[in-house]
């Protein structure tokens, strides 16, 4: 796997790795990913410098193997930080996303028992009703910003309803999800940004602690009430665990769909044949998976390898940090032919890793697919002549949870 680290190669690897985090790569990170892929072997690039080393994974097989391995630990760096010094860090430390093994199984089991396929399917009519209303408003204006007008409010209202949160707090909750996203993957985590995140985390803690007390005394419909009451062998979620995982569900239930909708429309604006095919068959069963593959709302995922992980005949050595470039894995030409092209007939679209795999597979995967398929069916049916008027929109300063800040469209 490793090649001799000559001075010339070290410079090439350093340049390729630095480009991954370059703000100029946000609008189109894929050339940077291909540079990393070209320098590696078998979809793995070993980057070793005097003060740090890591494995950068661009291959689908390598990313899939690490995601599924019990030796690939999530959140080790988070758990080693001092949660007493940062409310934001403390918030992350109890999220099941950053736990492993039995601890992760316990947290996921307690939360997933309140997040069933039946509950998700029950959201379909709500999603359709919300889309009707949001798209009516968009049609009345002849267009607008798809982020502010559709992709932010839709998943926010759905997950808030599922959790049992009041609709009049929507703006506050959306702001909180942005703080969580900035904490997990944002660029330039300045003292000012961290101060805002910590302030939001304190506000979240106070809000959810008070709400949990109310729900335990007076249960109401919704996942939060179920999470407050659910027990496994007499054990229930602690205060920190309830808070952190409620915030995780709120943020994850919002960010994936919120970023995918404008990202998908932007890609489709550049591939008019794919848009025309969608208009012709707006309920094609591959729509959600093909857009998840191409857009990859979560571009990176990190793991610490506690032991060797095998990828075919290759061995990834334990003790390494592994940076999984999911956006590259989902466009691996060895797995997906013509990978940059949106192809609704692609036979293996569902092999994407946009929702992870293995023990940390996205708990809300079925909800994300439902929202994506219903949204694009509604857009293609209502607005067959939809046009993206700014094909070079601004992106959020977040290479991990990549998303468009604003996307102007016309629907007249």
Task: Give residue ranges: language-model regions.
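Cytochrome P450
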Residues: 1-412
């Amino acid at each position: 796997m490793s090649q001799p680290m000559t001075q010339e190669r070290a410079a090439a690897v350093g340049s390729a790795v630095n480009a991954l985090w370059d703000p100029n790569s946000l609008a189109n990170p894929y050339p940077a990913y291909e540079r990393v892929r070209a320098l590696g072997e078998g979809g793995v690039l070993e980057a070793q410098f005097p003060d740090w080393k890591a494995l950068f994974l661009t291959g689908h097989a390598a990313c899939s193997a690490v995601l599924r391995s019990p030796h690939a630990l999530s959140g080790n760096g988070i758990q080693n930080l001092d949660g007493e010094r940062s409310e934001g860090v403390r918030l992350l430390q109890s999220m099941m996303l950053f736990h492993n093994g039995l601890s992760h199984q316990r947290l996921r089991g307690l939360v997933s028992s309140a997040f069933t396929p039946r509950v998700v399917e029950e959201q379909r009519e709500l999603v359709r009703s919300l889309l009707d209303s949001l798209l009516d408003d968009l049609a009345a204006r002849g267009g607008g910003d798809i982020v502010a007008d559709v992709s932010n409010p839709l998943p926010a209202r759905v997950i808030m309803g599922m959790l049992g949160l009041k609709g009049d707090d929507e703006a506050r909750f959306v702001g909180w999800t942005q703080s969580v996203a900035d904490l997990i993957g944002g660029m330039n985590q300045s003292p000012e940004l961290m101060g805002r995140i910590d302030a939001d985390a304190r506000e979240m803690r106070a809000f959810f602690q008070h709400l949990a007390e109310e729900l335990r005394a007076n249960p109401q419909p919704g996942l939060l009430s179920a999470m407050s009451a659910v027990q496994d062998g007499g054990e229930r979620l602690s205060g920190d665990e309830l808070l952190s995982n409620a915030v995780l569900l709120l943020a994850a239930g919002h960010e994936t769909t919120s970023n995918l909708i404008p990202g998908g429309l932007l890609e489709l604006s550049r591939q008019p044949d794919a848009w025309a095919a969608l208009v012709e068959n707006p309920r094609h069963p591959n729509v959600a998976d093909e857009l998840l593959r191409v857009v990859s709302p979560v571009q990176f995922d990190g793991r610490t390898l506690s032991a060797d992980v095998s990828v075919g005949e290759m061995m990834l050595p334990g003790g390494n940090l592994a940076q999984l470039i999911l956006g590259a894995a989902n466009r691996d030409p060895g797995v997906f032919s013509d990978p940059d092209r949106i192809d609704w007939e692609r036979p293996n679209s569902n092999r994407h890793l946009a929702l992870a795999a293995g023990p940390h597979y996205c708990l809300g995967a079925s909800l994300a697919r439902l929202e994506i398929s219903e949204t694009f069916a509604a857009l293609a049916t209502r607005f067959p002549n939809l046009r993206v008027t700014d094909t070079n929109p601004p992106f959020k300063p977040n290479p991990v949870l990549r998303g468009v800040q604003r996307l102007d469209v016309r629907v007249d």
